[in-house]
């Protein structure tokens, strides 16, 4: 999805009114004079749009492109279980199907709020489950431009928030909110997220490394609505501004409320994932 920030005379006039207009759309949303409260409220509204999904299954194509334009592709499945305990995070599992050299590799994540997320990987070549250290979650996941922590559930309580501005993002209007991780061992000092003010879905996230230097940008596209309630982006594009590499994730075959249970998200189930 492209983002056009060029302002015509008309859109410039509209932009000057955006904070007031966005506030009017959400009567309970704190005003621009309360940037921290406003930023957190936007995150809470976004989170609320996804409550009650139960569980999901989907398939994904991962396209890796290096700085020379060389491309490699991987196929995997992604399962998620909503945690009924609202004080804790969701559970997820990723299973690689292609290419042959990574087939059967699987990662299990238990997301938490401020406690370190728990992550394990099953490596078929070694026939064992390996726990991923909390201090290593800023590293690249399976050679992609996504870090291990990027695949963890983005719980509201993991961050502090500060609303920066409202501005046009493509044909939409977006709230621009700075997030700073409250949990240990993040690879990011902060991220800046663009969330549309209509459906409250993420449109773009810019990541800054621990030294506060621009690191990478994630854009979301091809949103589709499921069960008349749950929005899912079918394409994610991550660009690393340092390595000049990119990773594209293309999602398909989303299914909701399939009957997955906690028994499908254990270390033993990692070994059985095929």
Which residues make up each language-model segment?
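Gly/Pro-enriched, hydrophobic low-complexity segments
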Residues: 108, 118-122, 128-132, 137-154, ...
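Surface-exposed beta-loop interaction hotspot
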Residues: 153-159, 166
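Short amphipathic beta-strand and strand-loop transition segments with alternating hydrophobic
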Residues: 77-84, 162-168, 222-224
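Bacterial N-terminal signal peptides that target proteins for export
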Residues: 2-12
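Sec/Tat signal peptide C-region and signal peptidase I cleavage site
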Residues: 20-24
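Bacterial N-terminal signal peptides
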Residues: 11-19
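Short, solvent-exposed mixed-charge patches
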Residues: 273-274
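N-terminal mature ectodomain segment of secretory-pathway/periplasmic proteins
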Residues: 27, 34-125
């Amino acid at each position: 999805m492209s983002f056009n920030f060029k302002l015509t005379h008309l859109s410039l006039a509209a932009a000057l009114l955006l904070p007031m207009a966005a506030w009017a759309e959400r009567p309970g949303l704190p005003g621009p004079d309360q940037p921290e409260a406003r930023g957190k409220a936007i995150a809470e509204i976004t989170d609320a749009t996804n409550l009650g999904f139960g569980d999901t299954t989907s398939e994904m194509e991962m396209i890796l492109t290096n700085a020379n334009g060389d491309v490699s592709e991987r196929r995997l499945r992604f399962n998620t279980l909503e945690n009924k305990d609202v004080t804790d995070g969701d559970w997820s599992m990723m299973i690689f199907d292609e290419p042959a050299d990574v087939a059967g590799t699987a990662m299990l994540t238990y997301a938490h709020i401020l406690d370190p997320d728990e992550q394990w990987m099953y490596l078929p070549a070694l026939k064992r489950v390996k726990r991923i250290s909390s201090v290593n979650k800023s590293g690249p996941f399976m050679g992609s431009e996504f870090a291990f922590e990027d695949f963890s559930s983005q719980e509201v309580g993991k961050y502090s928030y500060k609303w920066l501005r409202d501005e046009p993002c493509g044909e939409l209007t977006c709230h621009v909110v700075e997030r700073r991780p409250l949990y240990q061992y993040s690879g990011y000092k902060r991220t800046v997220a663009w969330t549309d003010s209509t459906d409250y879905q993420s449109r773009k996230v810019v990541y800054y490394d621990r030294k506060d230097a621009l690191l990478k940008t994630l854009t979301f596209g091809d949103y589709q609505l499921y069960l008349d309630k749950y929005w899912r982006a079918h394409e994610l594009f991550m660009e690393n501004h340092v390595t000049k590499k990119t990773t594209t994730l293309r999602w398909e075959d989303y299914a909701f409320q399939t009957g997955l249970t906690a028994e499908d998200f254990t270390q033993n189930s990692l070994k059985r994932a095929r």
